[in-house]
UniProtKB/Swiss-Prot annotation:
Source superkingdom: Bacteria
Alphabetical keyword list: Chaperone
Presence of the UniProt keyword Chaperone in the record: yes
Role this protein plays: Co-chaperone involved in the maturation of iron-sulfur cluster-containing proteins. Seems to help targeting proteins to be folded toward HscA.
GO function terms (MF aspect): ATPase activator activity; protein-folding chaperone binding
Source organism per UniProt: Vibrio campbellii (strain ATCC BAA-1116)
Record's keyword annotation contains Chaperone: yes
Family classification: Belongs to the HscB family.
CC per GO annotation: iron-sulfur cluster transfer complex
Annotated ranges, domain J: 2-74
A Pfam cross-reference name: DnaJ
Protein name in UniProt: Co-chaperone protein HscB homolog
InterPro entries (alphabetical): DnaJ_domain, HscB, HscB_C_sf, HscB_oligo_C, J_dom_sf
Length: 171
């Protein structure tokens, strides 16, 4: 049983987040180890394992990048943990330029405003790549989707770096 089947969801990238959450809460209640306190040792162990499986599956499906990686793996394209280098020099150059731009924000005349504008630009880029991943996965374009997920991971890391700069500026 795959993660989508576990939650009774269609096996596709686009999913209903509120339905995922409600199914998660329902499964958590049903397989909570306390419900098996008087059961046999074997049944208690199975309940603990099922609860762990439910939690793991929820974490994977809840986040778009891990959900895309999971769908790719389910379709024979494993990219988790791989050390494949990015093959798109234009994208890598753009990422380097964006990181330089982020570094320069602290020295700008209005760093808060500059950071807001920069964050908006990066968020737009993230959403565009996410929409492309969805299309590529829906069309079964596994290699293209895998490449796009690699790019999304770069952008997500940049978004985290933006949050760190924001914390420094506001803190």
């Amino acid at each position: 049983m795959n993660h989508f089947e576990l939650f009774g969801l269609p096996s596709q990238f686009q999913l209903d987040g509120s339905l995922l959450s409600s199914q998660f809460r329902e499964l958590q209640k049903r397989f909570h180890p306390d419900n098996f306190a008087t059961a046999s040792e074997r049944d208690r162990l199975m309940a603990v394992q099922k609860a762990a499986q439910i939690n793991d599956a929820y974490q994977v499906l809840k986040h778009p990048i891990s959900r895309a990686e999971y769908i790719l793996a389910e379709n024979g394209t494993e990219i988790r943990g791989e050390q494949q280098t990015m093959q798109d020099p234009m994208f890598l150059m753009e990422q380097m330029e964006l990181r330089e731009e982020l570094e320069d924000i602290a020295d700008s005349s209005d760093p808060e405003s500059a950071l807001f504008d920069f964050d908006s630009k990066v968020s737009k880029m993230y959403k565009q790549h996410l929409a492309s991943v969805e299309q590529e996965l829906d069309q079964g374009l596994w290699a293209e989707a895998a490449d796009r997920v690699r790019k999304l991971k770069f952008i997500a890391k940049l978004k985290n770096e933006i949050e760190l700069v924001e914390d420094k500026l506001l803190g």
